[in-house]
A protein has these predicted regions:
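Phosphate-coordination loops involved in phosphoryl transfer and adenosine-cofactor binding
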Residues: 2-4, 73, 110
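Short hydrophobic/aromatic-enriched beta-strand-loop microsegments
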Residues: 29, 74-79, 94-99
Length: 124
């Protein structure tokens, strides 16, 4: 069971929404963003599920900087609106692309999220 989640871009509106939701169900959440980029390696090392939640124009740049650090025993997800940016390749780690069908909310209970297995494994 996943207990430690890292959200890269977790200080933005969507990242904050999911940070609160995960913390409300007792999960540990580590956040990094452009102001705390030095914490990114620690986030990657300690997280079982890594979520990329950055603006579309930064998605590829940030993903390229972290993709070789993600281990096979970790799950990676992007919460980016445009799915063709990252989904055209094969990866050594489990990659589940996600698209929340809602904007920033105080409570995500009952909301829908589209999940797309890009590179599936035991978690999906």
């Amino acid at each position: 069971m996943i207990k430690n989640i890292g959200i890269i871009g977790g200080s933005g509106k969507i990242g904050t929404t999911f940070k609160k939701a995960f913390e409300n169900i007792g999960l540990n959440v580590i956040v990094s963003d452009h102001k705390t980029k030095d914490q990114e390696n620690d986030l990657i090392n300690k997280s079982e599920w890594i979520i990329l939640c950055v603006p579309i124009d930064k998605t590829l740049e940030v993903f390229d900087s972290i993709k070789n650090k993600i281990r096979k025993d970790q799950v990676f997800s992007d919460f980016t609106s445009v799915k063709s940016i990252l989904g055209n390749n094969t990866y050594d780690f489990e990659f589940i692309s996600c698209h929340p069908l809602f904007g920033p909310l105080n409570n995500i209970i009952g909301q829908n999220i589209v999940t797309i297995p890009i590179s599936s494994g035991s978690f999906y």
